[in-house]
Amino acid sequence: MNRPHRGALHERHRIWRGRTRRDLADAYEPYLRREGIPPLQEKALGVQLFREDREEETEFVTISYWPDVDAMASFTGGDPRKIHHLPRDEEFLVELPERVTVMRILVTQLPRD
């Protein structure tokens, strides 16, 4: 059953997307896990990392969950849509993303036990 979400878990999320060539994806994933995910684990309510291997490139998506936009702004130093590029992102990514997407969560359905 879908229920309106009212702050029990999280209210907002930031979505970052980055693409690598397929031949670089296996090197980028552990780098992203080691350098990009820990700051989110420390500051956000939660974080997820996704990977989709396509024919010629791989897309990585990071979703981090936040109580509100102010918490995101505190993490980024002002603009909640600002990206924290990792030192080696330029080496790995097909193009450097300019912004993250910030969205408000309207419905949350969690798996049943």
Task: Map each language-model feature to its residues.
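An amphipathic, aromatic/His-enriched active-site/gating alpha helix that lines ligand/cofactor pockets
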Residues: 30, 34-46, 65-101
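Short, surface-exposed ligand-recognition loops at beta-strand->loop->(often short) alpha-helix junctions
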Residues: 19-30
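Non-catalytic surface loops within mature trypsin-like serine protease
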Residues: 22, 68, 104-107
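Short, well-ordered beta-strand segments in beta-rich or mixed alpha/beta enzyme
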Residues: 12-18, 48-80
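Short acidic, gly/pro-rich beta-turn/loop elements at beta-sheet edges
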Residues: 26-28, 57, 72-74, 110-112
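Glycine-rich beta-strand-turn "strand-cap" elements at beta-sheet edges
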Residues: 1-10, 45-61, 84-113
